[in-house]
Amino acid sequence: MSVQKMMPIINYLGTGRRKSAVARVRLVPGNGEVIINGLPGTNYLQFNGSYLSAVRSPLETLGLEDNYDIIVKAVGGGLTGQAEAIRLGVARALCTIDTSNRHPLKKEGFLTRDSRVKERKKYGLKKARKAPQFSKR
């Protein structure tokens, strides 16, 4: 009996957050496929071109769009938040591949976490800032 040696699977990990969405991203050497929660990226992002381009944009900036497969576990939020969380996760994973990737990604703004989140509703108001109609008399 011969023992086969397994080739180590090379994973590059990155986590992205946006609004209430969290995306755990794995970059694996491949041919440019995007798999989100077990579905092809085009299906999961409902064939929306802007979401797909947002997910791929860090790879396109570095010219690596056909070199890595993107495998994502995304939870929380909506599709926009998840797509932008995936973009941040991909950019962070690319930084773990090679530190020289950091400068062009930072210049394009892919490594900046968008800290805007929904403001909470306050009591006495209808929404976060909308007050009930004021009647003088």
Swiss-Prot record:
Keyword field: Chloroplast, Plastid, Ribonucleoprotein, Ribosomal protein
GO CC terms, sorted: chloroplast; cytosolic small ribosomal subunit
Tree of life domain: Eukaryota
Localization, UniProt: Plastid, Chloroplast
Leader sequence segment: none
Keyword Plastid (UniProt): yes
SUPFAM superfamilies (alphabetical): Ribosomal protein S5 domain 2-like (SSF54211)
InterPro entries found in the cross-reference section: Ribosomal_Su5_D2-typ_SF, Ribosomal_uS9, Ribosomal_uS9_bac/plastid, Ribosomal_uS9_CS, Ribsml_uS5_D2-typ_fold_subgr
Molecular function terms from GO: RNA binding; structural constituent of ribosome
GO BP of this protein: translation
HAMAP family assigned: Ribosomal_uS9_B
Alphabetized NCBIfam families for the sequence: PRK00132.1
Entry's family note: Belongs to the universal ribosomal protein uS9 family.
Identification of the protein by name: Small ribosomal subunit protein uS9c
Organism: Mesostigma viride
